[in-house]
Amino acid sequence: MKKIVYFSGEWCAPCKVMLPLVKEATKKHKVPLEIYDTENDDKLAIQMGVIQLPTIIRVEDGVEMRRMVGLHPKYEVEKFVSAS
């Protein structure tokens, strides 16, 4: 099963731009989305090696398949989420 894991921070301006794009793409493609604020819950971010925000990770069957870091246009987010 595929899911998208999204790491952000309250202070992160690019995160605020990316979150609506990620939410829209995951809803459109019916992909589960998990959102983590690294300010409040950094354990998973550390475990997954997240060092920049925003970081979006595509996980399939518990294995990281790909990650996207930083600000990206809508079409790239769509492609990232919809890829199999």
Regions found by a protein language model. Name each.
Residues 13, 40-43, 75:
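Short alpha-helical
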Residues 1-25:
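Local sequence-structure signature of Cys/Sec-based thiol-disulfide redox active-site neighborhoods
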Residues 48-57:
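Structural micro-motif
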Residues 58-84:
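Non-catalytic, surface beta->alpha helical segment in thiol-disulfide oxidoreductase systems
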Residues 6-7, 26, 30-43:
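Thiol-based oxidoreductase modules, predominantly thioredoxin-like and allied folds used
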Residues 23, 27, 31, 61-64:
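A structural signal for the main folded, soluble domain(s) of proteins
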Residues 38, 50, 70:
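Conserved strand-loop elements at the edges of beta-sheets that form or border functional pockets
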